[in-house]
């Protein structure tokens, strides 16, 4: 299997044909059950697949990707690979937090911290009425960061909440 260094919306995918398609991941992220194509109806680790064109592309993922080593938001149940495996993203242009992806030294220890674009879903998929966007973060963002603190992010398909609440899921009562 051949993999590229590009990821789709911050989430790795791979080419089952053994060649690099429009969205491939680094070899460390590649697993046989990860990111199968052909369906925009399924979700990736609880989040809808994202397509900039609004149609199903080769980058759509199935939930089985959540069972193996993939980069994913913190609200997913499975423990997956380190964020460093998704250094490049094709999320799009608009970003909700931060101005872009940067790589540099942070903190007194001098450790390198990699900032990643994590995509929130396309409104055409889940009816959130929010445009596709990215959150730039060194760590997987919270549901509210991804969804601009909208009540819709309390949906089970987003954060694993048991029900939707009329108030924002960032509030303590959620």
UniProtKB/Swiss-Prot annotation:
Keywords tagged on the record: Keratin, Repeat
Example of a GO cellular component annotation carried by this entry: cytosol
Free-text tissue specificity from the UniProt record: Expressed in the middle/upper portions of the hair cortex, in the region termed the keratogenous zone.
Residue numbers spanned by region 15 X 5 AA repeats of C-C-[QEPVRC]-[TPIVLE]-[SRHVP]: 3-172
Subunit-structure text: Interacts with hair keratins.
Family from the record: Belongs to the KRTAP type 1 family.
Protein purpose: In the hair cortex, hair keratin intermediate filaments are embedded in an interfilamentous matrix, consisting of hair keratin-associated proteins (KRTAP), which are essential for the formation of a rigid and resistant hair shaft through their extensive disulfide bond cross-linking with abundant cysteine residues of hair keratins. The matrix proteins include the high-sulfur and high-glycine-tyrosine keratins.
Protein's recorded name: Keratin-associated protein 1-5
Organism of this sequence: Homo sapiens (Human)
Organism classification: Eukaryota, Metazoa, Chordata, Craniata, Vertebrata
């Amino acid at each position: 299997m051949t993999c590229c260094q590009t990821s789709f919306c911050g989430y790795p995918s791979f080419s089952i044909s053994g060649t690099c398609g429009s969205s491939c991941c680094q070899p460390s992220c590649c697993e046989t059950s990860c990111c199968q194509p052909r369906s925009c109806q399924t979700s990736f680790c609880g989040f809808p697949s994202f397509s900039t064109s609004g149609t199903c592309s080769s980058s759509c993922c199935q939930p089985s990707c959540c069972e193996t080593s993939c980069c994913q938001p913190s609200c997913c149940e499975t423990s997956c690979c380190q964020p460093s495996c998704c250094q490049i993203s094709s999320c799009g242009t608009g970003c909700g937090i931060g101005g872009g992806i940067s790589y540099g030294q942070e903190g007194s220890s001098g450790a390198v911290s990699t900032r990643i674009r994590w995509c929130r879903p396309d409104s055409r998929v889940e009816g959130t009425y929010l445009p596709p966007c990215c959150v730039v973060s060194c760590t997987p963002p919270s549901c509210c960061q991804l969804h601009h603190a909208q009540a819709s992010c309390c949906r089970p398909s987003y954060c694993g909440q048991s029900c939707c609440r009329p108030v924002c899921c960032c509030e303590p009562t959620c």
